[in-house]
Amino acid sequence: MRKFLLALLLTFVACVAFSQNATYFGYVRDANKKPVEFANVIVVGTNIGASTDASGYFEINVPAGQDLEVQISFLGYEPFSQKIKLKPNERKQVTAVLNEGAVMLPTADIGATSERQVSGTRLNPQISMKIPTTGGFEDILKALPSVSSNNELSSQYNVRGGNYDENLVFVNDIEVYRPQLIRSGQQEGLSFINPDMVSSILFSAGAFEPKYGDKMSSVLDIKYKKPTEFGASIMASLLGANAHVEGTSKNHLFRYNVGLRYKTSRYLLASMDVSGHYDPSYVDAQTFLIYNVTEKLELNFLGNFSSNKYKYIPLDGETSFGTVSDALKIRTYFEGQEVDRFNSGTAAFSVNYTPSNNLSLKFIASGYYTNEEETYDILAQYYLNEIDQQLGATTGDSVSNIGVGSFLDHARNYYDGFVVSAKHIGTFVKDENKLDWGVQTNYENYSYHVHEWTMNDSADYSLPYSDNAVLLYLTDIANIGLQSIRASAYVQDSYLFKAEGADVSLGGGVRFNFWSFNKQFLASPRVNLSVKPTNWKPDMIFRFATGLYHQPPTIKEARRISDGTLNPNLKAQSSAQVVVGMDYNFLAWGRPFKLVAEAYYKYMYNLNPYNVDNVQIKYYGENIAHGYAYGIEAKVNGEFVPGTESWVSLGLMRTYEDIENDFYTRTVENVVDTVYPGYIPRPTDQLVNFGIFFQDYIPKAPTWKVFLSLHFGTGLPYGPPNSERYMATGRMKAYRRVDFGISKQFNFKKADWIKDFWISLEVFNLLNTKNEISHTWITDIRGRDYAVPSYLTGIRPNLKIVVKF
């Protein structure tokens, strides 16, 4: 593999010699006919390029008699491209006009000045079709320095020290919900977002505007396409298949955007340590319909149905762990099976009314339903052995058996949810002033039944041991329901103006929220400011944002971990956030780049502590903690290779919490001492998050492209089950993953109905790294406890074919 990669890299540096040349020259202007300095001019697929001077002028020599494509780009503007074929010694002049817009990068677009004044990152949904990924669109989010996820099987993600439940997701201004009974990435299917149907995506990692709801960590704002012409696509791989079609009626009054997806992770799961029969099946169908009644009145419908089924019959597994001096191996044999089902549906009707160019009104009525079932009975019998790891040992044979035992896991969990929502949002724009407002009411009806337990038999003794009864190791039982009403409203205003030597954007507003279950009324004021110096030559913008962010509980958060009952006095978790940042557009090696850096601090109060196992979160159901999170982040996007965009990102973060009134006692030399743990790491505390995405093409053969993604994240805290949070003193191994892909694009000149056709070969987990996701605790014959790691997927190749019409 190393020799192959080395040969591939050497191929990239090959140069093309041209015997006859022509000249391509001209000027680059913006929409106001002003010259664009430092615009990047390249001949696609070659190393030929130049940058414009102060007058916007450029001149390049190109090979004569060949079909070439010239691309002109500058950060913050839509690229200009032109296909040419020049005669020997011919001089061709052009005036290229660049319009302000978005230059899509793999992880973010570099928007125009107006876009850069709003805190957030624009993402390209189509890049998920090209990069090697085992998941869906969310893998693009995981490339950002503020986002962490140590599980390639899951679409869930943490943002700046928050957990999975602290992230907002909107599609066409409709909130998207995630499954509640999911406990592992193996159970997860397709996320709501269908990249084939998406037109724009905005992600904010914190300190977002009042219009974006009531969560503490992040918001993902997605808009689906309103097509203007016919289009379709088909994708097939070893992990599933997608198809989508979009188009309009002849009079363009009716438009449609429909997608169908199928996914199976059986191929991936076969690379895990536990062998067995995996039978996952995930199906998702979506439709977005648009009808223009008049020029000012538009009707929309968004529908989604998702069916995820997961059947699992484990057979046996073998896991090695420990250290060089204390190497261990556990062999496990299983009986039983797990059968899960997750069905959900969404239907939303909206009316968009634009009475004038200044005023826009939208009315939405939506409904969401979910039905989830998780059932399993699995008996696991294990044998724990010490391994011979002395120098010269080649077999790794067992030296001695130090533990024998079994686990019996049982669950009958059911969750039903129904949400009906009515919402109105409006926007009024006057000159440089923009006013937004909105009101919303939700009716929620949930039914939540949990019945699960674990029996632990170690060396013929049931743990915990009792002379009088057989006790269960873990139990979780609840039978609860909840009907409630949520109401919210917001108003915000933003104003653009010129100050001495700077363009300034100032925005602010307040959000209100009320929940009938706990009778709590909340107000969340928020302010943001951006300044772009105009008397500086560097193209830089500085940003500041602050505000209060409240997260009203859900039924899952309100369920007490102690007895499974609902806590009607549970308050919203809250945080005060401050974010300062800057972004800087610059040229390096004559090519465009962008640096984005941010620092943040969050003080959190009324926290509801929780434990995490794999992707399952269980809350205490009490406001008994306060904490903080702080960090710095930096990301550089740009053309490391001419004509292609790559990135590198780094995030440093700490998040701690102090659980009130927690303590333990210890005895030292017959003296009993009371210890108060104080601030302890939160379950999402991850010091370093580092990522690279790199893409390249073969000179003289630009239809061959190579993609490489790398992710490194330091270990997360963990501790034994049924223990206090301060006992989570262990750290998982660092998450390390490299994914590689190579693709070939084909052009069918005779079949012009095929717009794009490409085949890619992907290699997931190229280095075959064993990444931990959770631990199982067992006891040996000496009474010592061991945390046996559960590993994620190993190396796996994948073949993918994409056709666009």
Predicted segments with their positions:
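Short, acidic, small-residue-rich periplasmic hinge/interaction motif at the N-terminus
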Residues: R29-A31, A39-V44, Q71-Y77, K87-K130, ...
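Short acidic/polar hinge/loop motifs at secondary-structure boundaries
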Residues: E59-N61, K130, E175-F203
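Gram-negative outer-membrane beta-barrel transporters
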Residues: L496-V504, Y601-Y603, N623-P720
